[in-house]
């Protein structure tokens, strides 16, 4: 994966040029997944990370960093069961992403990479052979120490930071709960070919205030998948992605192979 924001010119308060940044990141990863039973599977991913803020200013120099990280995940999906007027099955999953050492953009200073935990679950209401309604709920938390006024968290190792992140918020347990974001969504699927989707994402106003609704649709025919989504901001804080419309197009080569 490669991501770049392009060249960005920086200026001081007087409008005088101070430098140019070209932030970009590159990730190369390899993954392995194993089905441990008919209903449960796990996976692990190891990745090389290169992050380059590419900024040389008048007072400091930020150097590119090279590091590695590990992702660990698990997924459980029950067998389809009858619930009277409909069939159904539920899903549970977890993902711990970006487990890895701290990085240094400035000599003598180290920063935590964004290790995070995701917990999710969902249920499929299988109404008949053509109609299915799926619901999903997900919680996410950064597994890094809370920044403190005295900067004492900087002396914490990345491994200790993962565990201490559950109890180091200055505001106690109530603030720890605010560090969780949550999202839920629903999808209506007809004949495994046409889908309508909606969802909501919420982050505490004290931790960033990202809050938005989403709407979307999808269409699948043979090996071709077309999806679109629209994001609507629900917060007083502006979101750079608000009122954005996204399109995606994908091909399933396995479907093409099966046809032949």
Label every PLM stretch briefly.
Residues 1-260:
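Subset of outer-membrane beta-barrel
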């Amino acid at each position: 994966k490669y991501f770049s924001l392009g060249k960005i010119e920086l200026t001081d308060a007087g409008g005088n040029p101070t430098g140019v940044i070209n932030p970009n990141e590159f990730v190369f990863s390899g993954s392995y997944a194993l089905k441990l039973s008919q209903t449960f599977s796990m996976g692990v991913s190891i990745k090389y990370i290169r992050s380059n803020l590419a900024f040389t200013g008048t007072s400091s120099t930020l150097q590119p960093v090279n590091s590695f990280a590990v992702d660990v995940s698990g997924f459980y999906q029950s067998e389809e069961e009858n619930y009277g007027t409909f069939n159904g099955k539920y899903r549970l999953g977890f993902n711990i992403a970006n487990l890895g050492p701290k990085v240094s953009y400035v000599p003598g200073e180290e920063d935590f990479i964004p290790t995070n935990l995701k917990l999710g679950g969902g249920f499929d209401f299988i109404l008949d052979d053509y109609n299915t309604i799926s619901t999903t709920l997900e919680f996410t938390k950064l597994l890094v120490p809370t920044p403190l006024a005295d900067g004492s968290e900087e002396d914490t190792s990345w491994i200790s930071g993962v565990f201490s992140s559950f109890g180091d918020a200055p505001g106690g347990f109530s603030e720890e709960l605010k560090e969780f974001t949550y999202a839920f969504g629903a999808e209506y699927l007809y004949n495994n070919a046409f889908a309508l989707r909606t969802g909501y994402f919420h982050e505490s106003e004290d931790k960033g205030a990202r809050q938005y609704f989403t709407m979307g649709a999808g269409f699948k025919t043979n090996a071709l998948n077309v999806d679109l989504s629209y994001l609507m901001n629900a917060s007083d804080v502006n979101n750079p992605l608000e009122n954005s419309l996204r399109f995606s197009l994908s091909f399933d080569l396995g479907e093409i192979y099966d046809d032949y």
